[in-house]
Amino acid sequence: MTAPTPENGCNKLQNMLQAAVQSVQWTYSLFWQICPQQLILVWGDGYYNGAIKTRKTVQPMEVSAEEASLQRSQQLRELYESLSAGETNPPTRRPCASLSPEDLTESEWFYLMCVSFSFPPGVGLPGKAYARRQHVWLTGANEVDSKTFSRAILAKSANIQTVVCIPVLDGVVEIGTTDKIQEDLNFIKHVRSFFIDHHSLPPKPALSEHSTSNPTYSTDHIPAIMYTVADPASTAIPNQDDMDEDEEEDDEDDEVESGSEDETNQGHNQHATSIIEAAEPSELMQIEMPDDIRIGSPNDGSNNLDSDFHLLAVSNQGNPSRQIDSYTTERWGPIEEPLDDSLQIQLSSSVLHHPLEDLTQEDTHYSQTVTTILQNQWIDSPSINYINYSTQSSFTTWTNHHFHPPPPPDPATSQWLVKYILFTVPYLHTKNHDETSPQTRDTAGVNSNDPSARLRGKGTPQDELSANHVLAERRRREKLNERFIILRSLVPFVTKMDKASILGDTIEYLKQLRRKIQDLETRNRQMESEKSGVTVLVGPTEKKKVRIVEGNGTGGGVRAKAVEVVASVQVSIIESDALLEIECLQREGLLLDVMMMLRELRIEVIGVQSSLNNGVFVAELRAKVKENGNGKKVSIVEVKRALNQIIPHNNI
């Protein structure tokens, strides 16, 4: 019986993942399978069932939700492969319906980044579930640290709150959602039922290099990426003593493919191997990041996806037939080879083991994966200049390409500078004199082609005339503004600060001053007439009568004769400011009655000047006009009518 093809295996696995995640309405489902060469859990297949930001399709008709999710899962995988392959291969033209990184939601980014992770048995949620052969349920995945969940930073960004890893016969099924769900054993049984009847134990890899009958991987699901072992000694396996000979022969084959290692790197490898055997493997990729883009802790909520990193150009030495996107659990060692003139980093194919820290390696893996994904996008941008730096030093090797000696001076330039100085310096102190000289103005048009005139900035007579007009107009406006400022300071009653209001208030103030002058002159004449005992008419326009002091013939006293005074009311309202002038016969409590009447009219008095002379009451009131309940203000006619009702109009 023939084994199933890889396409059938992938479709079968994806159908099971699709059925499982859609039955529980979670966000995504993944299958982690054992890599037969490295004996670690790697990404086998997945199905995305979450929110979609931008749909890109070439199909003319609408598709169902299931077909859209299936197509989205395939597009996400194609996007990751195209971006990862762009690290070493030149980018190829992609179809117009292909996704771009800016088309993804945060949950799609989480699904895409999961492809780059790998888990040794006992490490991470999938590794623990596989090693213990029991499920692992994590609630609040976006709130824990990287020790508990190595993808905590991604989960925090995508708001993935619940992650469940369920071991099956030949791998681990991971399913996640953006909702916070508590552990449920019936849920575990339900999801496991989709896989328990379809998978069988994969055949064991042949331990003898002479056997070719056994396949190297399970035929039920084919890994999408071939994985290579950078150093077999770094992988802890139970039958280490039984497979020493096989590993030595495999090492010889690897040396033929990848080339001989440097002696210095071999020494580091031997020392690092003894350290790494006692430590727990981590999840790292083959790109080392500079210190300025390492992510300190997932708890701070930092997200450096949009930062402009300095990218490292990794050159894989060895057989080109090897897959470029292979994964290892090792870190790059120090660079021993010197930098060449073009500052390109030449990395040795050998890698070194280092002791593991608590959080550095998980965060480094996250930063490295983001850089690998986005590197192809940044390379396409013409506005970014890349310089390759060493990860071990902040300095670069000096080369003569960076030093450009200054070019020898051009004799023509020196001559031009000398001429410019000779023509310009003599006219610096005589510039004002030349501009005001009539002779210069007359000859400016004739000598317009003179180079000295051009150097002095001379123009045509029309230009000079226009410039003079502009300067004159500017000075006139400045003087006018200064005078308005002085006028505003002289007028005590200014309603607004614009020029028209200042002029209007000034005119009104002058009228008031004129009336006061007339009143004072009238009083002076009245006082003089009282002294002489002669009746004096004030004037034809005033229509006033004053008290005349007459002496009787017997000299028994002075009798005051009261005459009638015509009442006068003047009201001026400008917006909310009001000025009221009242002149009438004196009455007890008249000023109080006037102020109460103004209060009823929603007029607030802010200043009062009043006087009483020979029974004549004169008052000047300044007030603010307020709006009534209807939003309207009282008019001048209404104020006059109200005041005329309370002031006396004839002699009592």
Swiss-Prot record:
PROSITE patterns attached to this UniProt entry: BHLH
Listed InterPro entries: bHLH-TF_ACT-like_plant, bHLH_dom, HLH_DNA-bd_sf, MYC/MYB_N
Name of this chain's protein: Basic helix-loop-helix protein A
Keywords: Activator, Flavonoid biosynthesis, Nucleus, Transcription, Transcription regulation
Entry-linked SMART domains: HLH (SM00353)
Entry superkingdom: Eukaryota
Pfam families xrefs: bHLH-MYC_N, bHLH-TF_ACT-like_plant, HLH
GO CC, one annotated term: nucleus
Cited function: Transcription activator involved in the control of flavonoid pigmentation.
Organism annotation: Pisum sativum
Region (Disordered): 233-271, 431-463
Other facts: Corresponds to one of the seven genes studied by Gregor Mendel in 1866. The white flowered cv. Cameor (a allele) has a truncated non-functional BHLH protein (AC E3SXU5) due to a point mutation resulting in a mis-spliced transcript.
Protein family per UniProt: Belongs to the bHLH protein family.
Annotated localization: Nucleus
Molecular function via GO: protein dimerization activity
Phylogenetic classification of the source organism: Eukaryota, Viridiplantae, Streptophyta, Embryophyta, Tracheophyta
